[in-house]
């Protein structure tokens, strides 16, 4: 266990070092400084010189705001969350929305769904339930190198459906490295060193990639999906329920994990090592060190199961009582969170309850503010007439094959999110695709869903996602290796996403992909 803790500390330091190296000591990097100036400049130039006859002044004003915010999001001229506060200032100044209307978007039900999800995830982490779940899954799947690789992917993917992708990978990487270290120490004379090294690289990448893939399983698994839910409601007044998305998302995760496992094991890092020296023994040892499940773990496990059941059965049960509109997914998330604050802890002097308000320090408030900013901007785009105008301009695409548009959108977003924030990418592109769907005469989810899913999937560069940065920080994989392997995983993801959106999602959600919805 000491080695595990030591390695976890080492990963954390390398993870932080990776990002600290990428930041300049100056207040702004060259790119940030350019973005800082370019954003307001585009705002002014748009107001002064862009005046189409069929676009009202309010539409021009919101377009100018959008260009400013998008520039600062992409270049990260100031923190992304700080940029997301601009609508509170700029939309009322242009008489687009009242201060009350803008501010209310930052308290949208969708934001509270994610807030509740974060609190539940932190409860799992505080009482170490996620580690027990992960080790149990790995132990059950088997002892061969192929099964250990699959076990780590299944465990990481499952965790990242409910806790952040970053937290899932941060937990699993030290365990993986400890197993590799044990294998090196117990290596037999006839064991091929190259095979162990190949397994080592495949395991590190498998953990990182599974953390990213698993986020697609639930609406709270990754920010782009919660943005999809919010933007879809904002533009069209329809809801994507937690349960229905799971029916779409979990099969997608299973297929992606399976194909990625096959690719890493038998193509990218093919080796002849069938069994890893000491691998299964170490997993059992770590499970034994956890001991019996504590009272607090049982409470969190029960709450987790309760939350899942309520999310899954909400629509079915509440329709019978005719109160569907009174209880949303966010309502359930906050109810579950309150239970965690109420139930006392027993086996510790440090924490009196399962969760206390100290947890607020760990919540990613910046992500929640970004969601609110995106929803406020979407409201401004709709209210100003900009959405209608954009739809008219995009009518030239009417007649282009919908499948071709889906392919282009998916691949474009997949590679764009390698160098930009996945959350900012989804926030910027989904309102445009909402309007585009009306222009080309297709259901909005045919365009918006693949973009949101693709925004989550970045496998090539350390800066693409926090999981990528963590596995790069392990020192076991080079950027060149990550890019070459990640390129093919990107393409695999694109193919699966397109097939799921075109053939599975319409059946599950009960939509006609050729039937557009009117904008609100």
From Swiss-Prot:
Chief location bin: membrane
One Pfam family, short name: Na_sulph_symp
Signal peptide start-end: none
GO cellular component: plasma membrane
InterPro entries: SLC13A/DASS
Residue spans crossing the bilayer: 30-50, 55-75, 77-97, 104-124, 160-180, 207-227, 242-262, 298-318, 323-343, 362-382, 399-419, 428-448, 452-472, 491-511
Molecular function, one GO term: organic anion transmembrane transporter activity
Lineage top rank: taxon: Bacteria
UniProt keywords, alphabetically: Cell membrane, Ion transport, Membrane, Sodium, Sodium transport, Symport, Transmembrane, Transmembrane helix, Transport
Entries under CDD domains matching the protein: SLC13_permease (cd01115)
Locations listed in the record: Cell membrane
Any single biological process term in GO: sodium ion transport
Purpose: Mediates the transport of the dicarboxylates fumarate, malate, and succinate across the cytoplasmic membrane via a Na(+)-electrochemical gradient.
PANTHER family: SOLUTE CARRIER FAMILY 13 MEMBER, SOLUTE CARRIER FAMILY 13 MEMBER 2
NCBIfam families, alphabetized: dass
Family: Belongs to the SLC13A/DASS transporter (TC 2.A.47) family. NADC subfamily.
Name the UniProt record assigns to this protein: Sodium-dependent dicarboxylate transporter SdcS
Organism listed in the record: Staphylococcus aureus (strain MSSA476)
